[in-house]
């Protein structure tokens, strides 16, 4: 299956021909992806809203998880 979006041949993290991450890349896009690497754990990826605290990267994924109250 696809590891990344093949739509843009200019993405330095994704091989547009195969839809696979390029060698050494952890991710191609996402709020917790920076220059083909996962952002460090606890990096803020979404600013606090109302009573909810900031959402932070896990260091293991390009996705920005919603705060779960734990």
Curated annotation (Swiss-Prot):
Compartments where found: Secreted
Cellular compartments per GO CC: extracellular region
S-S bonds: 4-19, 6-14, 13-36, 27-33, 32-57, 45-64
UniProt keyword list: Cell adhesion impairing toxin, Disulfide bond, Hemostasis impairing toxin, Platelet aggregation inhibiting toxin, Secreted, Toxin
Function: Inhibits fibrinogen interaction with platelets. Acts by binding to alpha-IIb/beta-3 (ITGA2B/ITGB3) on the platelet surface and inhibits aggregation induced by ADP, thrombin, platelet-activating factor and collagen.
Subunit annotation: Monomer.
Name of the protein in its database record: Disintegrin triflavin
Source organism of this protein record: Protobothrops flavoviridis
Native organism taxonomy: Eukaryota, Metazoa, Chordata, Craniata, Vertebrata
């Amino acid at each position: 299956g696809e590891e990344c979006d093949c739509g843009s041949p200019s993405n330095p993290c994704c091989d547009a021909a195969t839809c696979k991450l390029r060698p050494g890349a952890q991710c191609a896009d996402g709020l917790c992806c920076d220059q083909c690497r996962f952002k460090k754990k606890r990096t803020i990826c979404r600013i606090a809203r109302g009573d909810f605290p900031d959402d932070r990267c896990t260091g293991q994924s390009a996705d920005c998880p919603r705060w779960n109250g734990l």
